[in-house]
Each structure stands twice: as C-alpha cells, then as structure tokens.
Amino acid sequence: MTRSNVIPMVLFAAIVISLGINTPQAANEIIARLFNKSISNTELQPSQADVDRFQSILTDKSEKEVRTILTQRALGNKITESVLADFADKNAIEPNEGEVQSAYSVIKLWTVDLDGNREFLGEELERYRLAMAHGMAKSWKVSKALYEAYGGDVVFQQDNPLTPVGAYQQLFEQYREKGEFVIYDPVFKAAFWSSVKMKYAKTYDPDNIDFSLPWWEKSMTAAEK
C-alpha cells in the first residue's frame, strides 16, 4: 500500500457499507473528473487477486461488496495522489540529496536481509532502495509543508508516522472549490468525503508534533538511547 492510503482499509470499508453499496449502472460510466480528466468506473476496477486478498480480511463481506469497496478506495487514492503531487509541484517541494541519503541509510537497514537474496540483483535492489528513499523523503517534506500551511490533526499511519489528516481535509476542500476535481456518483462522493473528514480516536498532542527532523531520524535517535 502507498503513502496515499489515508484511511485504513477496515475503517474505509465500514464507511462504505454504512452508506450503502451501490455501483454505477454502466461499467464505463464517468464517476468523477480530476484535473479535467474523466475517470470511469472501469479504470478503477480491482484485479481478482486483490478482491480475493481483501475478502480474506473482510470475511463478512461478499465479493461484490469487497469489489465496490476497492473501487471506491481506488478513486480516493487517485484523488489523493494527484492532489498531493500538484501541491508539491506548485510549491517546488523536492527532497535534497542529504534527505534522500538519510532515508536511504534507514531503508538499507530495513532491507539488509535482501542483500543475500538471489531473487534480487545488486543493481536492481539499489534502484529499489533509492526510489523508496526518494519517495519517503518527499512524503515527509510534503507533510511538513502541509502542516506548516494548514495545521490540524496529525495521526500515526504505518507508511507515514506523521500524517497531517487535518491539512489533507483543508487541501482537498480547496481543490474541490477550485473545480480541480468533482465526484459525480453520490455514493463515491459520500464515501470519499466521509473518509477525509473522519475523526480519529488517537491524534498527536500539538506539543508533540515535530517536523524539524524527518521522522525516521528521530526514531533512530530514540532507539539508540
């Protein structure tokens, strides 16, 4: 799962089910527009492998329900990734070499067991680590910029321990008001905005929100104490 998974899968499923499971009548029905590009139901459809995998987790849901949940989640991911990328581009947010190297050193520690794995060629593994490092450093830098611009709640998520969900909400609302994206299907629309506006049970105390250093550097420092 990527850093655009703002809402945990099970919570997202609960939202969708509570709103009612309805899919567009036609498989190619246009359900949203994102930066002047139409998004059809067809392009959001999950693979059968993904349906089977998540149905093994959401055991009380039918295949149809799981497929709908994944389709709506795919739309949320597409909007999230595109809006965050646009925000980063407009604000010229890119990690510097030191930030990427810092992330790389941590990722190398996390993946040290792969060094002796014959399934991974040395050069291929290094490209993977560098790509992961760049993505992680940029994600932290975008989160930092969003929090500094909008404030709001920050929560822990597996792929981003400092996820500024309050800032996400304000950013998405601004992009919606500017017409940068619109969701036509009422159920998709309700599910997306319910997930964006979700109130988390556990949020960081404002005094403990610190973007002065990348979160992985602080974690490593704490582990060494």
Which ranges hold each PLM region?
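Short, charged low-complexity intrinsically disordered segments located at boundaries
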Residues: 77-84, 117, 135-137, 200-207
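A structural motif
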Residues: 111-116, 134-142
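Contiguous hydrophobic segments
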Residues: 38, 61, 92-107, 144-169, ...
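N-terminal targeting/tethering segments
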Residues: 23-130
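Short, low-structural-confidence N-terminal segments
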Residues: 1-72, 166-225
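Acidic/polar surface patches and capping/hinge elements
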Residues: 125-130, 140-186, 196, 212
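Hydrophobic transmembrane signal anchors and adjacent membrane-proximal interface regions, especially
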Residues: 15, 109-112, 152-156, 198
